[in-house]
């Protein structure tokens, strides 16, 4: 299967045309318009600093349904201690920078990625979840929200269970808002342990179509910060 070379024109080939590894296209740019178009079509960018921009739509697709988040017995005990505070959209750039820093030398979160997703955040499409301990940022995640779908990009942790706490809180808030799924993109055992599953790409695209039929919860998500914090059940 050939890999398509993008031009300045804002268009993507159909996701079903991706090669067996999931690579669909190469080139283009990371403008907000192109990124949003990609997510709406089940496509995401993933590349290293020394590579051209690569666009992916793997089959199968790893997703997490918010209601299916797994909270282990040990994690429930940890959450009961209430050691962490979780917030939304209070320091997006700090979160994405930490995601990049902890993968230094082996990261797709390039300066261009940071700038592009920060612009998406300013436009109300990209969001961060932050985990705090005694006033210090110790974990978090970021991603893009369109319709009733959340597209997870990366998470980090510098203390035990900090990123898990952020993800659990996100799932609970998204479930309350009727979100259909979190796109985890590519399978990992860690994601599976948290409840993520692989589904066929065609099924993922059907969920995506259904999710995009709803209005996007656009803007800053700080309103979540006024609500009750993470539940342990």
Swiss-Prot record:
GO terms for cellular component: cytoplasm. Belongs to the L/F-transferase family. GO terms for biological process: protein catabolic process. Signal peptide: none annotated. It is found in: Cytoplasm. Keywords: Acyltransferase, Cytoplasm, Transferase. It catalyses: N-terminal L-lysyl-[protein] + L-leucyl-tRNA(Leu) = N-terminal L-leucyl-L-lysyl-[protein] + tRNA(Leu) + H(+); N-terminal L-arginyl-[protein] + L-leucyl-tRNA(Leu) = N-terminal L-leucyl-L-arginyl-[protein] + tRNA(Leu) + H(+); L-phenylalanyl-tRNA(Phe) + an N-terminal L-alpha-aminoacyl-[protein] = an N-terminal L-phenylalanyl-L-alpha-aminoacyl-[protein] + tRNA(Phe). Functions in the N-end rule pathway of protein degradation where it conjugates Leu, Phe and, less efficiently, Met from aminoacyl-tRNAs to the N-termini of proteins containing an N-terminal arginine or lysine. GO terms for molecular function: leucyl-tRNA--protein transferase activity. Its EC number is 2.3.2.6. InterPro entries: Acyl_CoA_acyltransferase, Leu/Phe-tRNA_Trfase, Leu/Phe-tRNA_Trfase_C, Leu/Phe-tRNA_Trfase_N. The gene is aat. This is Leucyl/phenylalanyl-tRNA--protein transferase.
């Amino acid at each position: 299967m050939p890999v398509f070379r993008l031009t300045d024109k804002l268009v993507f080939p159909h996701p079903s045309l991706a090669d067996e590894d999931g690579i669909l296209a190469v080139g283009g740019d990371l403008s907000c318009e192109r990124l949003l178009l990609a997510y709406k079509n089940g496509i995401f960018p993933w590349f290293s600093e020394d590579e051209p921009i690569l666009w992916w739509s793997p089959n199968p697709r790893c997703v997490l349904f918010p209601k299916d988040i797994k909270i282990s017995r040990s994690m429930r005990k940890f959450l009961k201690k209430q050691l962490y505070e979780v917030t939304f959209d209070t320091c997006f750039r700090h979160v994405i920078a930490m995601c990049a820093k902890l993968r230094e030398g082996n990261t797709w979160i390039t300066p261009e990625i940071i700038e592009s997703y920060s612009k998406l955040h300013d436009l109300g499409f990209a969001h961060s979840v932050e985990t705090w301990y005694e006033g210090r940022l110790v974990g978090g995640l970021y991603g893009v929200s369109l319709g009733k779908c959340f597209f997870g990009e990366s998470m980090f942790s510098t203390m035990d269970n900090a990123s898990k706490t952020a993800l659990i809180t996100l799932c609970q808030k998204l479930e309350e808002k009727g979100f259909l799924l979190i796109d985890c993109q590519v399978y990992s055992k860690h994601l599976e342990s948290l409840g993520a599953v692989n589904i066929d790409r065609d099924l993922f695209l059907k969920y995506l179509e259904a999710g995009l039929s709803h209005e996007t919860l656009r803007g800053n998500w700080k309103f979540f910060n006024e609500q009750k914090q993470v539940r342990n059940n």
